[in-house]
Swiss-Prot record:
Job of this protein: Seems to be required for maximal rate of protein biosynthesis. Enhances ribosome dissociation into subunits and stabilizes the binding of the initiator Met-tRNA(I) to 40 S ribosomal subunits.
Protein name as it appears in the record: Translation initiation factor 1A
InterPro entries recorded: NA-bd_OB-fold, RNA-binding_domain_S1_IF1, TIF_eIF-1A, TIF_eIF-1A_CS
Organism: Methanococcus maripaludis (strain C7 / ATCC BAA-1331)
UniProt-listed Pfam families: eIF-1a
GO molecular function: RNA binding; translation initiation factor activity
Region described as Disordered: 1-20
Protein's gene: eIF1A
Domain spans labelled S1-like: 12-87
Residue stretches of biased makeup (Low complexity): 1-14
Entry-linked HAMAP family: aIF_1A
Record bears the keyword Protein biosynthesis: yes
Annotated keywords: Initiation factor, Protein biosynthesis
The family this protein is said to belong to: Belongs to the eIF-1A family.
């Protein structure tokens, strides 16, 4: 298998936003530095997101990544926490199922 690429696999399970926990899909528009990002959310709001340390150490978050965010209880229209980042295969699945219609 050396030098050969494995065929793309369908994701077996994709995490979707939990509405009872106030989670929203979003797309990272801009990296601001100091673990902060600007996120365009599916409810039409532009929020400043914070990447928590446990997520920051595990995965890299870049511009145009699709993420799940939770708005803060105070200043919920302005600030949020990034809690999940989707891979390319998961984004394709979300697109097919209609979750990413807000991006169009």
């Amino acid at each position: 298998m050396r030098g050969q690429q494995a065929p793309p696999q369908q994701p077996t399970r994709v995490r979707t936003p939990r509405e009872n926990e106030n989670e929203v899909l979003g797309v990272i528009e801009q990296m601001l530095g100091a673990s902060r990002v600007r996120v365009r959310c599916m409810d039409g709001k532009l929020r400043m997101g914070r990447i928590p340390g446990k997520l920051k150490r595990k995965i890299w978050v870049r511009e145009d990544d699709v993420v799940i965010v939770t708005p803060w209880e105070v200043q919920s229209d302005e600030k949020c926490d990034v809690i999940w980042r989707y891979t390319k295969g998961q984004v394709d699945w979300l697109n097919k199922k209609g979750y990413l219609d807000f991006m169009r």
